[in-house]
Amino acid sequence: SSSNNKLIPGKKAFELYDTYGFPVDLTNLILEERGFNLDIESFNSELEKQKDRSRKAAEISFDDWMVLIDDPVQEFVGYDSLEANVKIVKYRKVKSKKDGIIFQLVFNLTPFYAESGGQIGDIGFIESNDGDVVHIHDTIKEGSLSIHLTKNLPKKLDLIFRAVVDSKNRFRIQCNHTATHLLHQALRNILGNHVEQKGSRVSSENFRFDFSHYSKLDQSDIISVENFVNSRIENSIDLIEERNVPLKKAQDDGAIGLFGEK
């Protein structure tokens, strides 16, 4: 019938939504303006199928922690050293559709920086005295603990291991982290103090910086920001390091606290 010919399959609208992010409400409105109707039931059916696929892909299961040492406090030494002699306090096996089987290791102390504040975690390896090397492909945070991710367990778990952070990778991350602060200051200097950092993602390859501003930057603004950042890099300003500074003093000294950052 003519009414059936004017009914557009929901699968077509879902492809627009899923692939290009085109809102289904807008698709429906455009179709209605042209005398067509969207089969919203079949659209919702496709949406549920996609949600189910995503749920299954994200399925992850954790084995219980296997505790080797009763040592609940973990020390981070990675600001001063990229190597440390460590013991494995506990470990567990994790299964997921995405990564297969991996292991999570907790050390009594660690030079590995765990993913935090938009900065990715360190990578590297641990090595035993008998030459057993296990690669650490990520470091994440769970509560106050740094957790080290690896594809394999060491052959012997009760040894002392030399934990080594990939120094070149860490240095690239540090450079990009510093660049976010330079960029933030450049934006505030050039666009105004209303600019606030809304989020960031810092890796060894690049960084993303999200910020608030009331309009799109024009080319002259972009060039000014680039010149500001590049001039500070070329000046090679000495770093003044301060640790464990009270919040009030840090803010009085000009630190900008962005506690809602993601």
Each language-model region and where it sits:
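A glycine- and charged-residue-rich anion-binding loop/surface
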Residues: 1-262
